[in-house]
Each structure stands twice: as C-alpha cells, then as structure tokens.
Amino acid sequence: YLNGKFEYMSEESRQRIADGIEELGYRPNALARSLKSKQSFVLGVIVSDITSPFSPILLKGISDCCDRFGYRILIANSDDEPRKERDYIMSMIDQSVDGIILNTTGGNDEFLRETADTGMKFVLADRTIDMDLFDTIHSADRDAIEQMMRYLKGAGYESVGYFTQPLTNSTRISRCQVFREIYSDYFNGTAQVYFLEKRQRDANVMQEYMRRNIDCKHAIFSGNGVSTMRIVQTMRDLNIEFPKETGLCGFDDWEWMNLVGGGLTTIDLPTYEVGKECVKRMMHLLHYARTGAPRTLELPCTLQIRQST
C-alpha cells in the first residue's frame, strides 16, 4: 500500500489501511525508505534563469507531478553559466539525487555525456544539446511559428521582423532558424532578424526596423517573453504605438501581456505540461529498463490573438 502498488489489494483492504494511517497519524520515514530501496526519491532540477517567468511555471509542473509519484525536488539556478551548471550537477550527484531534469545553458555537451556514462539519468526541459543522448521535452515551436506567420499574412501584414536576444542557447537558435527558413513561404524579400544585445542599444535596433519597413504594413515577432518586455519598453520610450504603427506578437503568454493596451498576440507555450512530462519521462527511466534511442516529445502551443496585431 505505502509503495502505491494496489493491484493485488481489494478495495476493502485499501480503505482499512488508509483509515488506520489517518487514525494513527502515520508518516512514512523517507530515510528508511531510501536506505531500503537505494534510492533517495529526490530529483535534481536545474533551470537556466530563475528570474524568467518561464522557470516558476516549469517548476510548478515538475513539483506537482513529483508529488504524485512521491518524489521531492532539489532546485538550482545556473544563471545561464555553463560552469555553474556543471558545479550544480556535481553537487546534486554528491547529494544522491536519483536523476536530474535540466533546462540547460548549453556548452556542456561533453560533460553531460561523461556524467551520463556514470549512470546518472537526465531529462532535458525545453532546451536541447547537439548530441542525441537524452530524452527531451519541449514545445512544438516550428508549428507555432507556421501558425503565427499564416495569421499575420491573413491579417494583411506585408513584412515581419524577428527580434531575439543573442543566439546563445538551442531554443533561440532553432526558433530563429525556423523563421528564416519559412519566411519566403509567406512574405516577399529576405527574412529580417534583429538582435537585442545591450539594453542601451535597443532603441537603435527599433529605429532601424521602423526605417526599413516604412513603406509597408509590418509586424514585430518576438523570440521570447524577455525580448517582448524589452520591445514594449523601447516602443514606449520612442512613442511607437501598436498596432497603429507596427504589429507586435511573440512567444510566451505571460500574465502581464494581456494587460498591455488591448493585449498582446502571443504563442502560449505548454510550459507547465513540459514540466509534468519531464517527470513522467524520468519515472520511466528510473523504474523501467531503457530500450531504444532517446525520445523527443513536442507539445503543441496555442495562438492567443489580441489587439496588438
């Protein structure tokens, strides 16, 4: 009963044990449980940027699903620094976590391969690595970009500029690459990509975009929620109105985005579900024999159409 194996128990027996546990106030001893099974029933979770609204949503999905399986989580934030990521992985191994769910910074592919060779289980959340080594759960970004481009074309836009932070991780790289690849399927000319690097130069980037597209109906497509925040701040500083002067849309559907103007058109990512699926995948790795190649699961996104476009 305490291990959740009910298949050989009658409903009457289950209820009798449950009543006894409640009456006695029994609480399982996690240490004794781990010593017997040689498992800690703890998963390590490393996120790349704890300040991003993406991370708490991901962690909520992971935590809720871990509760269901009787696991606890140990959380660390790598600050998008590969060295910190390596240090936290080693620290979690020293603390005997059963597996690690990793929202990776990138730049640690060989280290991860060597660590996995020692037996540590990894599941990648949202971001991938170059080597096909680990099960990965992320959003179906290509389909989402296709949906957004079709919508913008249908709404009468003639040109779209893609705004992104520097391409330092797999998600930014893949989204930008897809945008470039499919742009000509919907619009004339070459794909326009604008990089938001130093905050003090955002106004220059925005002005360049506005000058380049002065003669057509145009829209900005933001690569993630952090970029969208910087774009909105810059447009406010330059007194640029959306959708009057340019349309605005992008990845991530954070709560504040519905409060700006008449709301921003967004791609609502299944971040909570990504967290849950990472845990389910980890449970499979820990409790069932591995067969076949690592698997990648893409979860569908939802377009939220609002007044910014």
Where are these regions (language model features)?
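Periplasmic-binding protein-like
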Residues: 89, 96-104, 161-164, 214-224, ...
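N-terminal helix-turn-helix DNA-binding module of bacterial transcription factors
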Residues: 1-39
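Hydrophobic alpha-helical segments within soluble ligand-binding/sensing domains
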Residues: 135-162, 177-181, 200-210, 228, ...
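Short beta-strand elements in bilobed, periplasmic/extracellular small-molecule ligand-binding domains
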Residues: 66-77, 159-162, 180-201
